[in-house]
């Protein structure tokens, strides 16, 4: 039989008393009153803050949005099918953060930056708040570097600078996403990190974009944030902010980034759904009163940072879908007033075979001209005016039977210039090739060709210049100017190739 020694027992008790530390843990807890449609009403949570993350009994995460006298309205980041009335809810004391880092490049993630491409976990370098404050006035500098899209009509007439916000707006099926993907593909071999945010799109459309970018070798420097049409409204609302946080990580390390929001109309609709279910008072088109702030606080995060902060930049290309070309609707007018210009895509132009279907007359870039390279300014200076005059004359010429020779010449030149701006999808052009293309048209070197021959002639000319006049390409690319030597070289190339083209 074991002998019990009192001194041994007393020493064990004494040891346990000495090691005891009193820890009081205060947890802010509430109870679910009602749940459904991605919304939960919670009783309790007395000290919860707006935007704070909540943890439900089944592990679902929510965000407290409505703080009322007797309950809290929260939106769920999940389907919430396992949440029941009476379940406990815990306030976490945190606001939404996402992991960020270099390893995200080439990956497809959801609105909480979790990988959804089946390629395993992503090693993060840190975290960033989903809702970060935008850089202040002192933290910024004016836009002065170009961001080349590879599309002649944009780079020549509606130039975009690094740190600018340029809206892409148009009806459905007018090529808005194509403009965005071409811009991403054109950054290949450069120093720009791209983030593409797909909001409320079909999963098949997102898969197609991933395939396009992979085939073009563009996924190496691209992150895709995707919340498809079947995702909860909360996640569709958060996706653009997650994309901005991922881009900000690179911007604050001194790098240039490009972020595309495709499209913000669907984010506004998701936010409207959440707000109406939370019983917030509806305003114009049933959107809540703070829908302008929804987009302004997102787009203000795009900036060109000052020297002290490393001169990084975030260029934003938000996309808005219009209904029947109506740009005076609520969301389009809001985003037009926030951004630094817009590229307007027209369904009529698209259907008549002009692609990209950019309506040059009502598209504008408010700050990009400061970023345009000198060579482009030299050759494209009159292009927009000539096309605007051509559009006016073309409308007039339908009613007039006899036109003088000068008008006929102007119409002929305009038709060739319009042909020059047509571009196949996923085939962006480098700056030197754009300069050569525009110069050929504006200087009348296409006037003696039939309109149907223009595109094949220009394609051949570009190949001829690359092969036989490589010094022209390097000269324009390095000096960013279009000097007399470059002009002579280009004139010679046009004359030489035209002889070959006509002979064939």
UniProtKB/Swiss-Prot annotation:
Q: InterPro entries from the entry?
A: ATP_synth_asu-like_sf, ATP_synth_asu_C, ATP_synth_asu_C_sf, ATP_synth_F1_a_nt-bd_dom, ATP_synth_F1_asu, ATPase_a/bsu_AS, ATPase_F1/V1/A1_a/bsu_N, ATPase_F1/V1/A1_a/bsu_N_sf
Residues the entry annotates as binding ATP: 170-177
Q: Name one GO cellular component term.
A: chloroplast thylakoid membrane
Task: List the molecular function annotations (GO) for this entry.
Answer: ADP binding; ATP binding; proton-transporting ATP synthase activity, rotational mechanism
Leader peptide range in chain numbering: none
Q: Which family does it belong to?
A: Belongs to the ATPase alpha/beta chains family.
| Reported function | Produces ATP from ADP in the presence of a proton gradient across the membrane. The alpha chain is a regulatory subunit.
| Name of the molecule in the record | ATP synthase subunit alpha, chloroplastic
Q: Which gene encodes it?
A: atpA
